[in-house]
Design a protein with these regions (language model features):
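Conserved catalytic core of sirtuin-type NAD+-dependent deacylases
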Residues: 1-233
Length: 233
């Protein structure tokens, strides 16, 4: 059986009410992105960065998975190991929708990482204050997020799975961080979902939905069905 990859970005979680720094409002309005999202910023003022991620965790607690998260969870349940679910998002909305085996390329907001033993543990939506590593008891901790100027270890997993993928689906990402047009070219068939027209990106894909993911996801699910039957989208 052929394999499918769904790679998602901020456009997947935006309908749930989660904003990114590109929206430049809400939580992000109060901060300089490079001060709170870069390795340099973290070295200069770790408390400011950790406070920022505390605020993001609190925000995450107040939103819910949307129809697209739930549909992807259903698709994963149906296609199992033949569907790779990869996301650039650091939220837990796919998991809360019931999706299994999600690969988070840029880290996971509910988790902290121990700088002493490299252990990773989940604190849910709690604040960073007074936490200690359950493994080595160290309090030398940080958020488990890949910041600007840092390596993303999960990219190795992404590229490994891409070489096994026949249908590539890009959801809610502009291609500014990852070269999704290259990924589309590596696969037999490809589908693009973006909110605004982008001719330079569209030309690499076989099928395009320029619309909100909430209205596109059921069509994409049908495309997957058709692809698994006869190899077409």
């Amino acid at each position: 059986m052929k394999n499918i990859m769904i790679l998602s970005g901020a456009g997947l979680s935006a309908p749930s009410g989660l904003k990114t720094f590109r929206d430049n409002d809400g939580l992000w309005e109060e901060y300089d992105v490079m001060e709170v999202c870069s390795a340099t910023g973290f070295r200069k003022n770790p408390k400011k960065v950790l406070d920022f991620y505390d605020a993001r965790r609190a925000q995450l607690q107040n939103v819910k998975p949307n129809h697209a998260h739930e549909k992807i969870a259903q698709l994963k349940e149906k296609w199992g190991k033949n569907l790779f679910v990869i996301t650039q998002n650091v939220d837990d909305l796919l998991e809360r929708a019931g999706c299994k085996d999600v690969v988070h390329l840029h880290g996971f907001l509910p988790e902290l990482r121990c700088l002493k033993c490299e252990g990773i543990f989940n604190i849910g939506y709690e604040k960073f204050t007074d936490k200690q590593c359950p493994k080595c008891k160290s309090k030398d901790l940080r958020h488990n997020i890949v910041m600007f100027e840092e390596q993303a270890p999960a990219y190795a997993t992404l590229y490994s799975l891409l070489h096994q993928t026949s249908l590539f689906i890009s959801i809610g990402t502009s291609g500014a961080v990852l070269p999704v047009e290259q990924y589309a070219s590596m696969c037999e068939k490809s589908i693009l979902n973006i909110y605004e027209k982008d001719v330079n990106l569209e030309r690499y894909f076989d099928k395009i939905y320029i619309e909100d993911i909430i209205s596109a996801i059921d069509k994409i699910a049908l495309d997957i069905e058709n692809f698994m039957k006869d190899g077409n989208v």
